[in-house]
């Protein structure tokens, strides 16, 4: 059975030759070179992924939603009751939440995964529960390092199993009351930013309670002293089971040479962890939308990412990842279905990339 170390070691590098061939093909399509902008860049990125066999393509699509509760909820950093995590997870199994509707529209399947809900097991939810909620990061670590490593490996294997069954495009999502607090702590640690710069309102936290949330994040970092150069240390000390789970999806998809669509702020924090654990993950990540959460810009700048959509969304759940799946499919359609300049006897002058 593959270990986490072996999985990380075996993440393939992008195929530079396939990317060069894709760029050459795109430049010869029936349009001025570069005129489809980032759609062209996305197609080239996809072409370099070994799991797609050298060409932009999308088979089955899946959004993996990691559900967990957080001990830091006790610090008054969220307005919703903790039980909402379990209620919404059950709603997801019925297909009635935001991510389910958007995923269905995109033709993607939603996998609802319990990695730490503080409730009885929920029918229809995949059971990977580590515990009933993680520790309160304001007073100690979220979990042990061994728990984080075991969950990373389990989720990575689950992701790779889906790849073997035909999934070629993954999206990540999460569900957990109070989880923007550990996400903000992780972003603060990885980017070296003060908590005040990255703490936002989450799920409509009143402005009068923001200062407390900032203080909680600062305390969590001061008490746990996470090492920003050790992604697993950060996840285990100031993260949460849902954030570890999303990181595991990224590691697993990268191991299979397949793309992962990020969601919003929570997924940015997991992406920072994934890229710290294994920098080889970065070429497989695709930013979907620009989260409305306060620390989004700082996290994305650290990842050197510019999302494709600006929708003022902050729902989470993987909703942005599902919404962006048709953009990935559009890049593939452009690559395979457009005509070629050579076949149309059109010769464009150089420097005509901005023509319409």
Curated annotation (Swiss-Prot):
EC number(s) per entry: 2.4.2.21
Family designation: Belongs to the CobT family.
Self-association and partners: Homodimer.
Catalytic activity as recorded in UniProt: 5,6-dimethylbenzimidazole + nicotinate beta-D-ribonucleotide = alpha-ribazole 5'-phosphate + nicotinate + H(+)
Molecular function in Gene Ontology: nicotinate-nucleotide-dimethylbenzimidazole phosphoribosyltransferase activity
GO biological process terms held by the UniProt record: cobalamin biosynthetic process
Recorded superkingdom: Bacteria
UniProt pathway: Nucleoside biosynthesis; alpha-ribazole biosynthesis; alpha-ribazole from 5,6-dimethylbenzimidazole: step 1/2
Pfam families per UniProt: DBI_PRT
Transferase found in the keyword field: yes
HAMAP family: CobT
Functional note: Catalyzes the synthesis of alpha-ribazole-5'-phosphate from nicotinate mononucleotide (NAMN) and 5,6-dimethylbenzimidazole (DMB).
InterPro entries membership: Nict_dMeBzImd_PRibTrfase, Nict_dMeBzImd_PRibTrfase_bact, Nict_dMeBzImd_PRibTrfase_N, Nict_dMeBzImd_PRibTrfase_sf
Gene designation: cobT
Keyword Transferase attributed: yes
TM annotation in the entry: none
Protein name: Nicotinate-nucleotide--dimethylbenzimidazole phosphoribosyltransferase
Active site: 317
Organism lineage: Bacteria, Pseudomonadati, Pseudomonadota, Gammaproteobacteria, Enterobacterales
